[in-house]
């Protein structure tokens, strides 16, 4: 028996077809399938034209952004139209993250990518979900909010002037074009999140410079950049903890020790900023970070095979 697993965001969907022995028969990508944004025809066209499988699956598990409780029947109906002989299930990307990270164990599952989300999970169901609210009102710790904090810092002087010039040169943008991207162009959240790789690169360059560069002034400038950015990222993750994770810890039954709950993360931001993330959760708040994954597919395959 084969199982088709999908992990879908708004921009792309990752697919994997596996057999009961755990052998991966197919992996591929299609456009993102978000039922909140796409019509039935749009979704059916993606499934019919972009997904070519070597064999028909017996089971389909689709995890996606936009798959709310009210959207589940519609998404499952569309999947059933494409795979009429299969047992089909559609669930939220958050439940997918919890299953990938924690399996059938209880804990706190977090997504830190372009956006942010989290939940308290009992090993089967999501018990609590702090509303993420999006990058304008919330999404603390996300790539979009890191980008927002960075731009605020370089233009208001909280971050070094040399870092501002470095970013403008790296991005090929100036102040008016940045304002245009944020306030007048669509998908500002994706632009803001695209700054995260620059932040990560700057934080790592100081180690490379210290090892290979004899220019002490250059090394000192890089160190200044790295320290300022590290502090900013720690602040972002601290806000994520305080505003999203604290409610779960407060809700845990008094007979349980909240600090015994493990916390796990999936997403590019969690992956690339693992050190400051662990600093906040393990050193500052004494929680156990059990796992950090860049993407959930490996964990989802393991979950559905065991």
PLM features per residue range, with description:
Residues 34-36, 52-90, 101-102, 185:
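Short beta-strand-loop/turn "lid" adjacent to the catalytic site in phosphate-handling enzymes
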Residues 86-110, 249:
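Conserved phosphate-binding catalytic cores of ATP/NTP-utilizing and phosphoryl-transfer enzymes
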Residues 63-68, 112-115, 261-270:
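Glycine-rich beta-strand-to-loop/alpha-helix junction loops that act as flexible
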């Amino acid at each position: 028996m084969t199982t088709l697993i999908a992990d879908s965001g708004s921009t792309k969907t990752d697919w994997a077809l596996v057999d009961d022995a755990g052998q991966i028969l197919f992996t591929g990508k299609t456009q993102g399938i978000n039922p909140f944004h796409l019509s039935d025809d749009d979704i059916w066209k993606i499934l019919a034209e972009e997904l070519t499988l070597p064999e028909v699956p017996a089971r389909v598990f689709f995890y996606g952004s936009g798959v709310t409780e009210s959207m589940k029947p519609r998404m499952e109906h569309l999947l059933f139209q494409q795979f009429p002989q299969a047992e089909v299930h559609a669930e939220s990307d958050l439940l997918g993250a919890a299953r990938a990270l924690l399996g059938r164990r209880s804990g706190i599952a977090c997504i830190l990518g372009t956006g942010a989300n989290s939940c308290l999970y009992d090993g089967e169901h999501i018990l609590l979900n702090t509303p993420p609210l999006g990058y304008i009102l919330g999404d603390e710790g996300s790539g979009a909010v890191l980008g927002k904090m960075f731009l605020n810092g370089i233009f208001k002087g909280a971050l070094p002037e040399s870092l501002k010039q470095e970013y403008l040169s790296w991005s090929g943008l100036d102040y008016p074009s940045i304002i245009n991207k944020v306030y007048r162009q669509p998908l500002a959240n994706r632009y803001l999140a695209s700054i995260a790789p620059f932040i990560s690169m700057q934080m790592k360059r100081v180690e490379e410079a210290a090892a290979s560069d004899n220019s002490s002034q250059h090394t000192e400038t890089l160190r200044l950049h790295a320290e300022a950015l590290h502090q900013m990222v720690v602040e972002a993750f601290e806000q994520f903890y305080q505003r999203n994770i604290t409610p779960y810890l407060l809700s845990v039954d008094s007979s349980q020790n909240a600090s015994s709950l493990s916390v796990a993360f999936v997403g590019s931001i969690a992956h690339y900023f693992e050190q400051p993330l662990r600093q906040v959760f393990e050193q500052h708040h004494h929680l156990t970070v059990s796992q950090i994954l860049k993407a959930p597919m490996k964990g989802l395959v393991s979950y559905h095979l065991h």
